[in-house]
Every structure is written in structure tokens, then in C-alpha cells.
Amino acid sequence: NKNIDEDNELYINELRDNDLEICKSKKIVTIDPGKNSLIYMLDEGKNKLRYSCCQRRRESLRKRCNKIILREKQKNQIIDEETKLSSYNCKSVNYNEFKEYIKEKTKLNDKVRGFYENELYRKLKWRTWIYGRKSEDKFLNNIEETYGKKEDLLLCYGNWSNNKQMKYIMPTKGVGLRRVIQKKFSVVLVDEF
């Protein structure tokens, strides 16, 4: 009995009357997504909650692990090897040029496979992922502590999404973070004009 868009996400203006009646009994919390403040939340009582990219980066140990990986890459001359590949065009429509690229890419993969299969590299990537999930779970618990039980909440999430990564800025979670929140809370999208 729900109207759903192509991404299987429900917009507030598409709710049916009986769904709207259910929503009226819930506490409404608005969410404004962004690049620096990944999530900025506000309810009717002006209670605020913020989840920033800096907080996520700090809690996930991402920057620290990336520095260690970069240092190891420099020590093992991985960056030099990977830079050689940049002289080839991977998007070429010329058969011979693309064939040369594939040959070089295969040689490079054979040379650097040992580094990427190294236990240190895999542990650092795993640690970043685990601590990232831990940070998200901590934030979800903060939502419940700040606004109440998940059964009593309706989160109105702005549908902003960044289609292109900004230059020199570390990538951040956008739609993925919304999906994490949707697994635990009732979420409807609000069209941001």
C-alpha cells in the first residue's frame, strides 16, 4: 500500500492517507545530508544531532591507516610501478593501444600482487571497514538516545546526493549512509528543490 519510486524509497508527498495518519502519531525528525556534515538532524524541540565527515574519519581510523599504506607503498616502490601505467590509455578505442594497455596492466598486477596480498595491507583495510561500521552503529545509537525509541520516530531525509566527487576532498558516504539509517529507522524522503 506504499507508493515507491525507482530506487524503492518512499517520498513523503507520495504517502497515502492511512500512511499519513500513522506518521502523525510519530515524532518527526528532519535530516539534512551534506558533504562536510554528513547528517544534520533537528526535531520539533530544536534538539540537534550532527554526524560529520571528520568525526567519521577519526572514528574509523581511515586517515591513519591510509598514511601507513602510503608509507609502505613508497617503501616498496609500488607508486612508481603504478605510475608507469598512466602513460597508457585505458579508454582507447584503438585495438592495438588497448591491447598494449592490457599487457602492461597484467604485468603490473603480477608485480604488485604480493604487496596487496600482504597481511598488513589486508588488516589495515579490514580495520578501516570495521571501525567505520562501529562509527555508524554508535551514531545510530546516538539517534535513539537523543530522539527516543525507533518505533516512535519518523525520519524525513532530504534527497540530496552528490553525483560527482569533488576534487581534493576525501570521499564520504551519502546514499550509503541513508541506507544504513533505513535499516534501523522509518525513513521517508523529502524533495530538496
Segments from the language model and where they lie:
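Positively charged, helix-rich recognition surfaces that bind polyanionic ligands
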Residues: 1-193
